[in-house]
Amino acid sequence: MAVTTVAQFAAELNRPAAALLEQLHSAGVAKASTDDALTEADKERLLDFLRSSHGTGSAERKKITLTKKSTTEIKQADASGKARTIQVEVRKKRTFIRRDDAPAAVEETTAAAPVIDEAELQKREEEASRQAELLRRQEEDLAEKRRAREAQEQAEREAAEARQRAAAEAAAAALEAAAAEPVVPAKVEATGVKAAAPDTAPAVAAPAEPPKPALRVVKAADIEAEEKQKAADLAKRRKAAEDEASAIRAMMNAPKKVLVAKKPEEPKPAEGIKGTIHKPTAKPGAPAAAGAAGAAKPGDKKSVKSEKLSSSWADDAAKKRAALRGGARPDAGGRGGWKAPRGGRRGGDRGDSPSTFTAPAEAQVYEVHVPETISVADLAHKMSVKASEVIKQLMKLGQMVTINQQLDQETAMILVEEMGHKAFTAKLDDPDAFLEDDVEVTDVPLEPRAPVVTVMGHVDHGKTSLLDYIRTTRVAAGEAGGITQHIGAYHVETPRGMITFLDTPGHEAFTAMRARGAKATDLVILVVAADDGVMPQTKEAIHHAKAAEVPLIVAINKIDKPGTNLERVRSELIAEQVVPEDFGGDSPFVQVSAKTGQGIDELLEQVLLQAEVLELQAQVAAPAKGLVIEAQLDKGRGPVATVLVQSGTLKRGDVVLAGSTYGRVRAMLDENGKPATEAGPSIPVEIQGLTEVPQAGDEFMVLSDERRAREIATFRSGKYRDVKLSKQQAAKLENMFETMGQGEVQTLPLIIKADVQGSQEALGASLLKLSTAEVKVQIVHAAVGGISESDVNLAIASKAVIIGFNVRADAGARKLAEGNNVDLRYYNIIYDAVDEIKSAMTGMLAPEQKEELIGTAEIRTVFVASKIGTVAGSMVTSGIVRRNARFRLLRENVVVYSGEIESVRRMKDDVREVKEGFECGIKLKNYNDIKEGDQLEVFEIKEVARTL
């Protein structure tokens, strides 16, 4: 720590060092020279000396006032019963006074006095002795006054005792005299006592009277007594304030009391009167009950039998009298005076006085059974809360919902637990639960059935042509574009037995159809073209067959074409885990030609051989079960479904349940369009009579009761609808913030109408795959059947393009579409529809901007024109320099500025462009910082159409 000398301190104070040294000597700080060190204590002593010499002294506060204010809120019901918040403000003010005793003050003053010289010291000593003498005299006076006061108090006590003794003696004498003369002498004795008392008291008190003290001592005693009284009053007020503050704190911190009404005790019957309804007579010595509870007034017409039973009877007379005087009515709920309502009986049953307290109801915990889907309103009703509370809680959980929105079971159960209730998975009253037991027939014997074979492979590999040769028909020629777009089901009678074939599409769009075909089949024939080998849909067919765990027979087709490489096909199939039997695998390879018929018999033999190994059996004399292969809406026949019977026998007139649809079989056709009365296992047929178009891939079964079928179908449709809505809403909410972040996204709304369910499903899936981050395909509606006016109206509202796949619009729909400029597109080949939609989406993409360099120029000189500004005299080194083109200014191969060329001049003429090898003057727009040697790159921005 730095040491401060006297000279340095004087420099800080801007005073001469000699004057500071003299002041230090006066303050009692012994410093010989200006080089001596000063401590903090020396500076404090100097400061105290200067303050006392200037008369300021220590500026200590003798009185401190503290003010404290606290605000609290209490809730209290007003006259109308509503809770009101009242603000309570508590203010506390305390004053602290510092009291110094006179002797201590004198000692401090004496100690703090500086030593100046001997004469002054002598004078101060004399003053101190005088002060001490004065204090001694004051103490003696106070002691003398205290002794006089004590003597006076002693004399008063003795006089009081003497008076009490005299009074006691007089009372004793009066009692003795009263025994002989009871009336008259008593007055005389009393008078004697009164007369004797004044004589006795002065006799006793006279000797105790002390001599009067001096006036000075009396004044000092009065001052001391007054100070003591003030101190006592101050202490009393302080204690009262502290008690009040502590009481308020205790009241605010105390827990709120819940008033619980006591259950009234039933009066116990008196002993000896049990079993009787008569009022017992009061005993003669017993006091009256009315006297114990307060005598009843003559005006009271009813007496209170028991205070515990009722307290209202006692008030009846008072209420009636108040009503007669115009006061409160007896039926006004106990309210009288200004609290009673003015007008008639209306409002007389409102709440009582604000002092009425209702105990809060205890929270009720409910057991909520949550189904698979439930609306917000229904869930709120089950928990006995308002729907708004449920919506608030869902918002806290991050779900934006409406009152009619469907919630899935998991979300609803989490919400119920969050709101303090118990959630249970509801046991649904599901009609499907016992459906299998109703339909199952166990006492019917199993019989052999024909195998169901699915033909799969890549597009144009000859699947349908292979079936054509087997069926000796020309089915492939009838398909649009020569490709299969429907799943076909045929059964063929061969010399070796019956076989049912399912022909699936090979186009990539029909993945779901191929999966359904693999699900319904017993065997899979994988057709591979010898010239193409394994293709993407070939690999997919292999995966479907393995997923369905069905045997695979490979038919290598088109072996009659020149240039085929069978070994390459084998190696590619082995790479896909399809190993031929020749190499130790389990898949027979057959070389066939659908054109010449080569290998067809061998292929059928392999199919029947595999079927014998599988030992395929099914019940015949039982209700039919099977699979919906394809479904469509026919204009004349209504909903039509192609079904494959897997077990039992389907007859005309049976009640069929297929997914969420049902109906009675009105007509049944085979694959050739001929009517049929029944169909056994492994037979595909076309049925009519369903209420709606079923979903392809749904299972169907025959029920004995149409009412039960309708009930199950209705339940399934409602359940599917609720689940679909909940999933749609969840998808919307999840994608909402993503869509907001992406900005504006182009959408292409479409309405798809197809001839069959499978084609509509495949077309919709293919078009949805075309969606990109900038252009999205939105399928507004997709259904089976012709294009109707309702479809056109939906397209008008949603600004959608209508796509008809193998269907057409009726006359009314065409007229409405022409009048409202609705785009109608018809297709019969699926990849034509996909290509056109893809080109339409390409046109909706924003064009891509690319820079094209058109020329360069070198700045040779820089000159300033008065009206134009800074002009760059340049030489065009390559390409052309064009007016209004964009440029980049390079200085030492570093881009300095990028902008636009304002004008180009050649020989004082304003020109549009200057070619290579010519000099020109270039004026740059809004830029003048150019130097000799800079390079200009001139370019144009061109828009290039983008493709998907």
Curated annotation (Swiss-Prot):
Residues 282-297 have a biased composition (Low complexity). Residues 593-595 are annotated as: G5. Residues 503-506 are annotated as: G3. Signal peptide: none annotated. Residues 482-486 are annotated as: G2. GO terms for cellular component: cytosol. GTP binds at residues 457-464, 503-507, 557-560. Residues 448-615 form the tr-type G domain. This is Translation initiation factor IF-2. It comes from Methylibium petroleiphilum (strain ATCC BAA-1232 / LMG 22953 / PM1).
